[in-house]
Amino acid sequence: MATEGAAQLGNRVAGMVCSLWVLLLVSSVLALEEVLLDTTGETSEIGWLTYPPGGWDEVSVLDDQRRLTRTFEACHVAGAPPGTGQDNWLQTHFVERRGAQRAHIRLHFSVRACSSLGVSGGTCRETFTLYYRQAEEPDSPDSVSSWHLKRWTKVDTIAADESFPSSSSSSSSSSAAWAVGPHGAGQRAGLQLNVKERSFGPLTQRGFYVAFQDTGACLALVAVRLFSYTCPAVLRSFASFPETQASGAGGASLVAAVGTCVAHAEPEEDGVGGQAGGSPPRLHCNGEGKWMVAVGGCRCQPGYQPARGDKACQACPRGLYKASAGNAPCSPCPARSHAANPAAPVCPCLEGFYRASSDPPEAPCTGPPSAPQELWFEVQGSALMLHWRLPRELGGRGDLLFNVVCKECEGRQEPASGGGGTCRRCRDEVHFDPRQRGLTESRVLVGGLRAHVPYILEVQAVNGVSELSPDPPQAAAINVSTSHEVPSAVPVVHQVSRASNSITVSWPQPDQTNGNILDYQLRYYDQVEDESHSFTLTSETNTATVTQLSPGHIYGFQVRARTAAGHGPYGGKVYFQTLPQGELSSQLPERLSLVIGSILGALAFLLLAAITVLAVVFQRKRRGTGYTEQLQQYSSPGLGVKYYIDPSTYEDPCQAIRELAREVDPAYIKIEEVIGTGSFGEVRRGRLQPRGRREQTVAIQALWAGGAESLQMTFLGRAAVLGQFQHPNILRLEGVVTKSRPLMVLTEFMELGPLDSFLRQREGQFSSLQLVAMQRGVAAAMQYLSSFAFVHRSLSAHSVLVNSHLVCKVARLGHSPQGPSCLLRWAAPEVIAHGKHTTSSDVWSFGILMWEVMSYGERPYWDMSEQEVLNAIEQEFRLPPPPGCPPGLHLLMLDTWQKDRARRPHFDQLVAAFDKMIRKPDTLQACGDPGERPSQALLTPVALDFPCLDSPQAWLSAIGLECYQDNFSKFGLCTFSDVAQLSLEDLPALGITLAGHQKKLLHHIQLLQQHLRQQGSVEV
């Protein structure tokens, strides 16, 4: 039997050695195994320490190539006296950990079935135990304390998946059971070789020992391989990540590795807004030596483009450029530019061409314009209108402007000569309309020119790059002069006489008439009016009387003269006042004064009455008009659309409150205990009992004392928004207090508070249909709000309140998110990117609310950071179904999370879908047609860190079901193996009767089974 066992073992060893190399070759693509110890194929004596001596035997067996390999064997079952137990130890040499934080061990062994050994009683085992012990230095040769069990840490009890029977039941000692004989090779077919892998850590000391304890088995330890997992060095996203040891905690724990950007690359920008100079990229190494969870990355610098995928950045070739950092390829140089050197961030312009400071690097280079063409002018008295045509060459730009240079010369000059030393800049009296520089049209009115004086007018063409050119602007010039000159200004105006409704004025002739004066033009205006409301009259003499003036008013007067050459300039302004009405009446007969006084008194009375009537009518009309104008902003005539009024459009927000909310007398309010604190002040429970009505419980929010006026307007404005809506699933406004302090807003009292905290406190207590009914109520409220074109902007489970009848009501209407990252977990992609809130973005937020409801108030995206949430949304990852969530509901969530907002369902469609689920509950389990919607990747929640959980009680606390810790202890569920055996039928006996808790517990039991299956410590 010993010969047969050895032959069978050798045959299995040969096959497993080959398989090991294949497995290592495949897995090395993803992870590196750094070998710390390996006895596979060892032929010389290994010499591990055994205790007691002879408990384990080191022997050689033949493989199928007739080569010896060393094994350790223990088989003392049959030879042991009855009633005595076996305790045989085998210890490895000191193993250097070499930086490993966690060690993995792979065992190849074979175990004989106790039934084949003919041993009765409980002394036979088919298992052995694995231990490890850390040490800073190897043990001294005479050390015996290493066998004390307290110094060792148990890794696991190793059980064989397959044990094999003995071909001869007469031998069960170690030497007989595993002896190598000349005929062994032909007797190895029945030998069963097991492979088990375990890990232990974290390792903190220089090295460690591994020990194997046999307590009565007949086994052969064929090969022992100790190794650690290492994530290989990798190039990814233009960053190099070093070889990184896996975490010592194992499992789902991660070790962050900081990457280094490859040459000519830089970290990507941080945050939503894109801050330059971002954080270095990070990649995480998991416990199995595999890279995962990339955070950030690098991008090629300006002048460099991606090469070899995302492994390197290479310089842009000559003639190409890249202006900004990123992973886009280089681009050909724009027109009239060229990059003579590689790695160009911008293409320099060719000679004679330029880029303005406002031009982007991708803009073509441009040049200054050529000179204007075909200058000509039209004389208009002492002024002239100068015209020209556009330049033949605009330089490739559209920002063409013109400047006019005026020179006054002595004698006849040629435009091209510039006048030499006989020309000078024009006098200040010469003016240009509309202006002298920066003209956009090809004409200008030049005034203030003297007659018979030669001028040179030069028109320059300029654009955005003219200042960059070393040459002066291209210009065209023309000689001009006027043959006639208008009169100079009238120097002064005198008052001759005045009355209550008229003034008579006179003036002298201009100092320089420059010809015969044909007439004068008098301009006058009331000082209380704008000068643009002036009147004119013409007089052929130097005297004029202005009539139909108002008594006691001050008027301004100006006069100008006209000759055949045209009007001269106006003189300076002078002011005269008409007589008051009282002074005029004193010169009239007494009777006439009485008549006029009576008439004026009657007129005054009638005027006062008319003003009073008009004021009342206007005020009423203003109220109605203001209200109507607000409505018209949101109406579509003829379509029967409901209206919503934005209180911020009122000039006086208090007017909006008076029209849209009901004022409550504070005497009817009884304030009780504080139930919370809002953004404006304390929220209290109270009672409201208006006269003639029954008492009702209300929530009262009072504004903080001393709040700024803007805060008061915001506080009342939100109440004005809420007061416009009447729906059973929208929080009802009971009234406001604005005529006394403090300002107060009264709403119906919602006993159970926000929906998210309500669900967290009652996890697992509702059926799926009850949760659907809650969501249906919120959807109905949002359908009602969308019919008013109202966008909520901050919809979440926290903004929904629950009353004692489990009715959900939408609240926080008119609350705008504060800051770019506020409510990011509920925000649609277009809101994050552009701040664009629509009813479609409310649909997205409602889908997140659905997920919150089905997960009993779980935080969306769990503990992911804001940046990780943003990256996940941009990469089109979506939340997975919560535990126990019916497939039909999760499909509805995915519909609300369509990236294209036009493809998201409307709220009326969501209400119809919920109604169908309530009428036909089997539709909750419908998976839908996979082709009807795009496939979306689902996020996975962060897994439990099982190595950190030392008991089922800690596990229950980690999954939020610590209320059942006493139940587990009472029924003796003290190990994870016991918990892993639980099924749905066992839960009621444990006192777990809530359907939601049962679903959650079974979900985590499945995860526990997967973990234990990987560890190989339980049969599930």
Curated annotation (Swiss-Prot):
GO CC, sorted alphabetically, is: dendrite; plasma membrane
GO terms assigned for molecular function:
ATP binding; transmembrane-ephrin receptor activity
Q: Which residues lie on this side of the membrane: Cytoplasmic?
A: 619-1020
Extracellular compartment spans = 32-597
Where, in this chain's numbering, is ATP bound? Answer: I675, G676, T677, G678, S679, F680, G681, E682, V683
Xref: InterPro entries: Eph_TM, Ephrin_rcpt_lig-bd_dom, Ephrin_rcpt_TKs, FN3_dom, FN3_sf, Galactose-bd-like_sf, Growth_fac_rcpt_cys_sf, Ig-like_fold
Q: Provide the record's note on post-translational modification.
A: Ligand-binding increases phosphorylation on tyrosine residues. Phosphorylation on tyrosine residues is mediated by transphosphorylation by the catalytically active EPHB1 in a ligand-independent manner. Tyrosine phosphorylation of the receptor may act as a switch on the functional transition from cell adhesion/attraction to de-adhesion/repulsion.
Domain Fibronectin type-III positions: 368-485, 486-581
The residues covered by the SAM domain are 947-1011
Which residue ranges traverse the bilayer? 598-618
- Name the chain's protein: Ephrin type-B receptor 6
Q: Which organism is it from?
A: Pan troglodytes
Q: What is the lineage of its organism?
A: Eukaryota, Metazoa, Chordata, Craniata, Vertebrata
Gene assigned in the entry: EPHB6
